[in-house]
Amino acid sequence: ETLDTLKVNSNNEWGKLRSIVVGTALNANFPQYDNLYTTSMSAGGWKKTPPPSGAVPEQIIEETEEDLNVLIHTLDKFAVSVYRPNTLNFNEIVSTPDWKTDSQYAYCPRDTHLVIGDMVIETPMTTRARQHEAILLDTIRRQAIRDGAKWISAPRPRLLDSENLVE
């Protein structure tokens, strides 16, 4: 798939928006518990309220997609090019040599990528369930590079249980 010309260039947060990647809730999943979540939760938050796991209810996905489509329609009125990430079955297990988990979603691409000038930096995630999310922008990545963008990946932590410094 080839997209329209995709020029990457962001030097501030208030210039005219010309293009954007809008996430998707399709196939969203509440991933299995990972003690690394404690790094982004208030102390004891998971102990007080056990996290859900498994597929996000279809009603939530449908309502979220409806809201995202309204956003996309609004952006289209302002001639903003909208790109969307690929999606996967996020219930399937992904792994590294150190761990296995299911995935989460393709809802928040801004969490996984930082744009500075004409460079996109893939940023590491703090949870295993989101560690491989950058591949969902692979079609966009290939097009941006063809159109002159620089694209690098920051080092990714191994996300070992022993690396969890928050108790």
What label would you give each PLM region?
Residues 1-167:
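The feature marks the mature, well-folded catalytic cores of soluble enzymes
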